[in-house]
Amino acid sequence: MKNDTSRFSIRRAEPGDYQAFASTFAGERAYSGTLQMPFPSQDSWRKRLAEPDPNSVVLVVEAEGEVIANAGLHPAQPVDIRRRRHAMTLGITVRDDWQGKGAGTKLMSALVDLADNWFGALRLELTVYTDNAAAIALYRKFGFTVEGTHRAYALRDGRLVDTYAMARLHPHPPSRAPANDTEPKVAAT
């Protein structure tokens, strides 16, 4: 059955969302699927949200009056390399009790729209654990493909685990809008 994403609303993250971020990343499935550590600090999230990167966008999904998911769209690192200006990275996290209900799809749709139509990004990149089948399926749904495997990429629960490097190229890179063929009429003086 297809998930109904109309019950979700998306907005920019705000400094007051720090408790929801800490709560989301406290979920075992959430932190084990990211590079976050267990027992997240509310204070560290408060600081990060109070001083956001001006070149990034951090979004949240709300449902039933609560923040249940978050995602970020960031310039590819290192940001001072001009030859990588066309690329952006993204990350997404859904609270454990909301996974598989469409919040990730809603966020991915918003991130891809922002990247394609507002940032003019030609390439989106992400890293995902090779055993995170649900996330991989979500990314594939939005046109991401596996470009390679990072072996022993991160320590998770006492084991070194692999990740996939996934990317998506803009399917229809921006072009110039058609020119207006008529000259503007200027009043004679």
Locate predicted features:
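Conserved GNAT acetyl-CoA-binding A-motif
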Residues: D116-T127
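Terminal substrate-recognition subdomain of acyl/acetyltransferases
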Residues: K2-N3, R159-T189
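Conserved active-site alpha-helix within GNAT-family acetyltransferase domains
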Residues: K101, T105-K106, N117, T130-G148
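Helix-loop element at the rim of GNAT/NAT acetyltransferase active sites that forms part
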Residues: A22-F39
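A short beta-loop-alpha structural element at the N-terminal edge
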Residues: F8-S23
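Acetyl-CoA-dependent GNAT
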Residues: P15-G16, T34-Q99, M108-S109, L114, ...
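Central antiparallel beta-sheet cores of small beta-barrel/beta-sandwich binding domains
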Residues: V67-A71, L126, D131
